[in-house]
Structures are given as structure tokens and as C-alpha cells.
Amino acid sequence: HRRSSAASDVYKRQEIQNWIERVAHLPADGLEDPPDACIIELGGTVGDIESSPYIEALRQFQFRVGRDNVTFVHVSLVPVMGPVGEQKTKPTQHSVKELRGLGITPDILVCRSTQPMTDETKEKLAAFCHVSPDAVMSTHDVPNIYHVPLMLEKQGLCKILGIDCNDTSVLEEWREMAYDLDKLTEDVSIAMVGKYTDLSDSYLSVIKSLQHAAMKVRRKLSINWIEASHLEDHWKTNNSDEYESAWQGLKESDGVLVPGGFGDRGVEGKINAARYARENNIPYLGICLGLQVATIEFCRNVLGMDGANSTEFDENAEYPAVIFMPEISKTHLGGTMRLGSRPTFWQVEDCKIKRLYGTDDSVDERHRHRYEVNPDIIENIEQAGMKFVGKDETGQRCEIFELDDHVYYVGVQYHPEFKSRPGRPSPPFLGLLMASSGLKL
């Protein structure tokens, strides 16, 4: 048994290295060329048992590809203590010692602090951590996170890595974006209606996508976090203050976003949010479950299907508007979802969301779902004004809807947040922010 466990550990470390080498050559900017570099983040704290297989895999990896092809960057906190604001180096010294004991020697130290590090602090860290003083980087507090790459470049990071920053205009474009972000004055607010609102990291990719789109339309973004269950009618009896607060937050927002999720908690609240946005011409974006609840709402309140629901929440729904996909196994739910990047083909010549994506006949986006809009009711839905403008390669599965005669009411079955980047926001998010800012689509 012990021998089997050891063999399993070896296999894991090999697979980690294989994965890194494979993804390091995948295009990351939407083009066909391989990337110049691959950044691998190993989170947590040095010495944690959870990260030990990855640290050992990286230790081996440096010899597998050659030490000249790997740079280890250690990110550490330099706390400021006492009334005089002394910068303490002991935490970083200790973590570097631990890391070197595990076989990894950092080439660069990136040190977080509230204020720029003094030369004395840098020299002390260099002496005790076995790195060049030029390789000790200060990353202090800045107005927005997009200043951080500029801060590192100014301290000579590109020179250490052997990168010619004059060979591209990307850094200058990034600099312009970072400083423009400091000057934004016009606000735009988006209501995020979800079930995990106490932990915003649950929606980190969605938040970043909203920020990317807000930068593009030159607006300061504020997110109104709304617990979906607080919008439900029964919550008025349970806690009237939370009910009123949730509805006030929704009504004060310029746009509404319902992200993906699983389970029935808060679903009726999401349906109420979709109805409010539809009836009041408020920009709306539904992602995955957000598309499904908007479809259910439309069936109930436009088509008169009072019992419409998803079979995920009611297996005996009178009108099953959203159903379990026939090819998915109900026995092994975790391994049989419709996953990964898949094409969606346009079904119309022109619509708002298609114009945002561009002129291609299809779009590739990442999926993660088990349920779909019931194909049997699509014709009824479209006749009432909700058009399924994007479908899968079979032409049967609905991927994108857009509502006629609405400023912006869009649902997507996939997860566009995973492809959004600074300077290249995801089209569905860009459309939401443009409409919420009063800009013409």
C-alpha cells in the first residue's frame, strides 16, 4: 500500500509538469502564435501541506526544462510596524529560507507593502535572501491594480527577464489604460443578483469582466451585491428590512446581472430580478443559470405558463421550460457535464450581441452546464419576442437569447467571463456596460 502511494505521488508530480509544459505553448491572446512566457501561480503559504506536491513538481521541473528557462518569483509581505513605520523583513527571510529548504531558490522577490520599500530594506532582503538587490521589487499600494506591472517595469523587471520592452506597444497601451482609470468620474452601477454574495471571490471572474468592460466605456464601476433569496416574496415576511433593502439596491442599479449557479436557493429571487429588468427596460445579462431563469420568467409572465420551471428545481413542473440534457448521465453528475470550449453559431443576420462579437459566423466560449432550454417551447418563445440568436452545431440547443424591443436583454448559456481580458472585455459584458451607461450599441 505504501509503495502504491509513493507511485501515485510520482505520477501526480509528473502530471503537474506535463500540464505546465502543455499549457505554456497554448496561445493566450486570441491569436495563433505561442506566448512569450507562461506564468504559473502557486498560492498559499510556503510549507503548507496542500502545496507540497506542487512545490516538489516545480523543483523537478526546473531541471526538466533547464534552469535558464525558469524564473522563480517569490511574493511576500513586508509589514510596517510601530509609530515610526519600520519595514520588517523577518517574514520574508523566513519564507525564503523555507522555500530554499524545499529545493527552490527565488530569483526575484516581489514585496507587498503599504509604502515604497527603502533602499535599506531592499539591501537587507538581498543579503539575507540570496538575491541581487536589483531583483528585490517593491509593490506598494497604488490607486488601481493596473499600475503594478508598470511599477515592476520601472524597477527593471523586464531587464532581469531579458525582455525588450521597446519591441512592443503593449506596455504603453497598458500605461494609458492604468492612468485613464484614475481619472474616471462618471459612475455606473450593476446589481449582481446571486446566492454566494457573502463571498465575492465566488464571482471573481465575473467581477473582473465587469471591470474590464467598465474601463472600456470609461466608467467607474460599483457593484450592488444582492442576495437573490431576499428578493423573494416570502422574505418580506421573514425579514422586511432585508427585503426592502434588496429591492432598493436592485432599483437603484443601472443594470442587472444574474451569474451562473446551481441549486434552488434564491432561484425565485433571480426570476423576480429578470422580470423587473424586462418590464422596466433595464439592461440585463444572464449567464448560464441567468439565461435559464430569464427563460422561465418569460414563459410564466409573457406566455402565461404559470407552472413553468426547470426540472432541476421541480421534476414535475407543469411546463418544463428548462430540462436535463438528454446525453447527460444522471448517475455520475460530476463527470458528465457539458464542459469546455464549444462553438455557438449565429442564427440571425444582425442583432446587438452579434455586433458586439464581430463578423464571424460563430463564437467559441466555455461551457459548464447540465440543463438547457426545452427545444419543444422555443418556437412559442420566439413568436413572443425572445429570439434565440445563437445555437450549437446541431441548431437545436439554445446558447444565446436576445429580447426584441429592449435596450439590452441578453442571456448566454456559456461563461463569457473566462475569456475577458483588460483592454479586450468580453462582448456580453461590454454590451451590458454600454447599455447601463446610456451608450448606443
In which residue ranges do the predicted regions lie?
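Loop/turn-to-beta-strand initiation segments
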Residues: 34-38, 70-71
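A short, aliphatic-rich alpha-helical micro-motif
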Residues: 4, 32, 247-252
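Cysteine-nucleophile active-site neighborhood
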Residues: 249-345, 350-352, 414-416, 422, ...
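Single conserved hydrophobic/aromatic residue that forms the stacking wall/gate
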Residues: 1-7, 11
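Glycine/threonine-rich flexible loop motifs
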Residues: 46-54, 84-85, 201-204, 261-272, ...
